[in-house]
């Protein structure tokens, strides 16, 4: 670049910084925030699938799936992990269905958790925006997008048509929220539900509620599904769960993770440590016996899980070694999920009015 251009650029950059504040424009190489801070999901395999060790701070995340698939459980685990780091968390409960006893069982400090149960969608998103702009809240959960009912719909009659109202509300709110979330380095998670599009002949008929805006603004989108039941005898005690990283702007997408969720206890970390330890040869398996560092640690997966639950030091050591191995880029991350088919935009069934 010649000298005149350099002088002109320096003058322009100086003027921009003077008018809009320091840091309003910078060279990417000068930025000290190249590494994205992440908050663990409570699942080691999902942290690995996300590529950065968890969900990214300063970004919007969408978690969606069918009913009883583990969406709220996963977000409560994120809150528990964030609170362990001393972070402040808020839960905007638009569904009015949060169970504090269950949250406490998952490790959430319910005494310190901020909770709001708003009356309307506008109120919920306004509260969310005020919390973000305070720069004092690190994690915000909105449960769920489908329950963010516009004020006009609540005040109207039961059968009234309100086409595109919720989509317009979400689009406007996300335009305001995105920059504030980045500046506050706050993780904002929207839980969403699934609906079926009518008349779809090819591809998946499933779509999420609230228009298309959230799909664009979200840096990470997670599709969570229940793929089986965990039984003790005839009694069902938990779910086998699969999470697909459908969209990821901070690492390669389309990875997937599988883990167990036990009723009343949440994600089984011990089960993940056993499975990943065996897969990556940190734990040796010969027949039904498992060995670690040359010593037998148990017969059968259930006994090893019990040992890890009791011996936190050993479990912590295995987890630390797995994180170092899997998140350094030395080993390929979990299996790839099948790429998600692009959804055709149907102007009639899902309009986003601005």
Swiss-Prot record:
One Pfam family named in its UniProt record: RecA
In terms of Gene3D superfamilies, this protein maps to: P-loop containing nucleotide triphosphate hydrolases (3.40.50.300)
What keywords tag this UniProt record?
ATP-binding, Cytoplasm, DNA damage, DNA recombination, DNA repair, DNA-binding, Nucleotide-binding, SOS response
Any one Gene Ontology MF annotation carried by this entry is: ATP hydrolysis activity
Reading the lineage from the top rank, the first entry is Bacteria
Supply the SMART domains for this chain: AAA (SM00382)
**Principal location class:** cytoplasm
Quick one: which residues bind ATP?
Answer: 65-72
Q: Where in the cell is it found?
A: Cytoplasm
Swiss-Prot/TrEMBL GO biological process terms: DNA recombination; DNA repair; SOS response
Q: Which PROSITE patterns match?
A: RECA_1, RECA_2, RECA_3
Can you quote a single GO CC term?
Answer: cytosol
**What is known about what this protein does?**
Can catalyze the hydrolysis of ATP in the presence of single-stranded DNA, the ATP-dependent uptake of single-stranded DNA by duplex DNA, and the ATP-dependent hybridization of homologous single-stranded DNAs. It interacts with LexA causing its activation and leading to its autocatalytic cleavage.
Recorded hits in PANTHER family, A to Z, give: MITOCHONDRIAL DNA REPAIR PROTEIN RECA HOMOLOG-RELATED, RECA
Q: Which family does it belong to?
A: Belongs to the RecA family.
Recorded protein name is Protein RecA
Q: Whose protein is this, by species?
A: Aeromonas hydrophila subsp. hydrophila (strain ATCC 7966 / DSM 30187 / BCRC 13018 / CCUG 14551 / JCM 1027 / KCTC 2358 / NCIMB 9240 / NCTC 8049)
Q: What is the lineage of its organism?
A: Bacteria, Pseudomonadati, Pseudomonadota, Gammaproteobacteria, Aeromonadales
């Amino acid at each position: 670049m010649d000298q005149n251009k350099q002088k002109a650029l320096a003058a322009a950059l100086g003027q921009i910084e003077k008018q809009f504040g320091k840091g309003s424009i910078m060279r990417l190489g000068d930025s000290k925030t190249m590494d994205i801070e992440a908050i663990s999901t409570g699942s080691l395999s999902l942290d690995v699938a996300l590529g950065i060790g968890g969900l990214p701070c300063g970004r919007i995340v969408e978690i969606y799936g069918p009913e009883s698939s583990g969406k709220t459980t996963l977000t409560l685990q994120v809150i528990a992990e964030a609170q362990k780091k001393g972070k402040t968390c808020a839960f905007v409960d638009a569904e009015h269905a949060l169970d504090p006893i269950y949250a406490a069982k998952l490790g959430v400090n319910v005494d310190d958790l901020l909770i709001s149960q708003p009356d309307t969608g506008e109120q919920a998103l306004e509260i969310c925006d005020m919390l973000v702009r305070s720069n004092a809240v690190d994690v915000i959960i909105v449960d769920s997008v489908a329950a963010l009912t516009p004020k006009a719909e609540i005040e109207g009659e039961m059968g009234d048509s309100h086409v595109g109202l919720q989509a317009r509300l979400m689009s406007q709110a996300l335009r305001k929220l995105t920059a504030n979330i980045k500046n506050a380095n706050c993780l904002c998670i929207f839980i969403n539900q699934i609906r079926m599009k009518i008349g779809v002949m090819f591809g998946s008929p499933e779509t999420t509620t609230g228009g298309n805006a959230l799909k664009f603004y979200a840096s990470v989108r997670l599709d969570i599904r229940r793929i089986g039941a965990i039984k003790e005898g005839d009694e069902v005690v938990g779910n086998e769960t699969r999470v697909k990283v459908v969209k990821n702007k901070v690492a390669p997408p389309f990875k997937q993770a599988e883990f167990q969720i036990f009723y009343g206890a949440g994600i089984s970390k011990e089960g993940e440590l056993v499975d990943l330890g065996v897969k990556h040869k940190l734990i040796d398996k010969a027949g039904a016996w498992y060995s670690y560092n040359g010593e037998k640690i148990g017969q059968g997966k259930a006994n090893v899980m019990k040992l890890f639950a009791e011996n936190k030091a050993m479990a912590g050591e295995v987890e630390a070694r797995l994180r170092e191995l899997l998140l350094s880029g030395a080993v390929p991350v979990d299996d790839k999920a099948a790429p998600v088919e692009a959804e055709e935009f149907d102007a009639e069934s899902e309009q986003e009015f601005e």
